[in-house]
Amino acid sequence: MNICVNSLYRLSTPQFHSLYSEDVSDEVLALLIGEVENGNQNCIDLLCNLALRNDDLGHKVEKLLFDLFSGKRSGSPDIDKKINQACLVLHQIANNDITKNNTEWKKLHAPSRLLYMAGSATTDLSKKIGIAHKIMGDQFAQTDQEQVGVENLWCSARMLSSDELAAATQGLVQESPFLSVNYPIGLIHPTTKENILSTQLLEKMAQSGLSENEVFLINTGDHWLICLFYKLAEKIKCLIFNTYYDLNENTKQEIIEAAKIAGISESDEVNFIEMNLQNNVPNGCSLFCYHTIQLLSNAGQNDPVTTLREFAEKFLTLSVEEQALFNTQTRRQIYEYSLQ
């Protein structure tokens, strides 16, 4: 028994048995996690079983597995595939006649990180849609362009909904003293043609004024971009970060007019960074908005223009494979906020 347990899990027999107790020591957990990070499939299976627990340990382990799956935590090159396959096996067990009503399998019958990972591994389309319905409910795309329906949950070209983008960006800056992020808006109201950014800025200025670094997530029709108001040498500046084709002049003018409400006196104080970063990140504008906020929240007092321009230029030097990996991992990291 000792030899078998040690060869499979790199744990002693007492350490292995302790996994079934209410409290698992940090030492045993660290040993198991180390093996998981190295791609040990037996340990991955074991950790996925621990993640089923509906207590602090179960939630901690489930989060750790998702961090490895989403690339937030580094592991062996194929770690995400090993983890989601292990979750898929558990999902199949959870849905057989014996266990389907067992509360111990609750995380595989309701929105959870484990269920999301299982769904990503499912190749059967009808089962994939069934899992997506459990996670999202009956959410459908409003237009052909807004690909937010359940059938597209794991699609590498899926457009994020406003609620998903809001959940991720608000969660991201919850503890950041540097940024204030507003709920995503459209630039122009589709029927009244009102400039919604202008309206939101007027409300902000009337209530509490703008923060030192105030972010607006703006949709120009079928595309998300970042609008940042910040102070530089006691002067209000505005930065637009657009990761697709250059905006048309009408759209730029609408943004410039709105910026005047915040105290921008000259149009040259509105800086447009426009580079197409989306060749290998289809419908990825919202992903870049999320990542931009991540960069800005970690940039401290650095000039945001320099920070974002350097990121964009560096991103364009990445290989196709590296850009595709950014697409996959960022989508997973963003959707995690909708699972909490």
Swiss-Prot record:
A Gene Ontology term for the protein's cellular component: host cell cytoplasm
Per the UniProt record, which EC number(s) apply here? 3.4.22.-
Which compartments is it annotated to reside in? Secreted; Host cytoplasm
Read off the Pfam families from this record. ElaD-SseL-like_C, ElaD_SseL-like_N
- At the top of the EC hierarchy, this enzyme's class is hydrolase
- Provide the active-site residues from the annotation: 223, 285
Q: Which UniProt keywords apply?
A: Host cytoplasm, Hydrolase, Protease, Secreted, Thiol protease, Virulence
Protein's name in the database: Deubiquitinase SseL
What are the protein's GO molecular function terms? cysteine-type peptidase activity
